[in-house]
Amino acid sequence: GQDSARRISEDARTWLPSGNRISNDRALRFSDNGRFLYFGTTPRRPEKDTTLLEDEIADVEVWTAEDARLYTQRNVQLSDDKKRTYLAVYNTQAGTGRQLASPEMPYEYLPRTANGPWIALYDDRPYAKQTMWEGYPGARNTEIVNLETGERKSMLNGEVTPVRWLEGGKFLVWYNQTDTTWNSYDPAAGTHHVLATNETGVFYDEINDRPMHPRSYGYQGTLKGGNKFLVADRYDLWELDPSARTPAKRLTRGREVDTRYFLRDLDPEDHFIDPTKKQLV
């Protein structure tokens, strides 16, 4: 490593979108391996016109019934909206920066370690009005970005699919509330797999009595190595393979005896589940 500080923000002029600046409204974050530095950018704010008197400054709020967000919700979120930043990254090994998020795809899913080489971005605003009426979580568009090359791949469009990274960052997984399936996406291969359906088991809330799609019984953790993960139904634990090479496997037999099994995490410092060790359920 180097023994002195080096200013890297000067290089931003070569990749930062025109009219944008590096923002101080988002904390800096290094990936666990130190390779990537994440930060936020934002459009430059217009200079305040100091020549106008207070009564010459327009102070009018206009809203309609067609707005995607309620007027009251917009007011509550106004401060956050003003501080909105878009994720960017600096590769400490290559010495290069890259804009990741944008006004068109403003939100991100980062793996816990943020080590890359992929991250996911999403936008739920096109479906905000639908979500307001039907309830959260709402539909969203999702894409993935390669931190090294900048390659982008469209992953999902218009699906009610808040996704999560498996530990290790190899796969994205999610439960689709609309069709009640468990799914995965392999960024490297660009492939989507349906891992469990209603023919496999009943993974949706069986006693849901709300006027909305039923939620799942939950993700339970990633097995050591990052190539398998566990989910629950009402009674049992299941092992799913995000590569879809092996079928879903039920690990317990609680449904037959009306006994519910859920995994208890006794070591929050260990982010993987070691299948060779005893687990508390």
Give residue ranges: language-model regions:
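Beta-propeller folds
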Residues: G1-V281
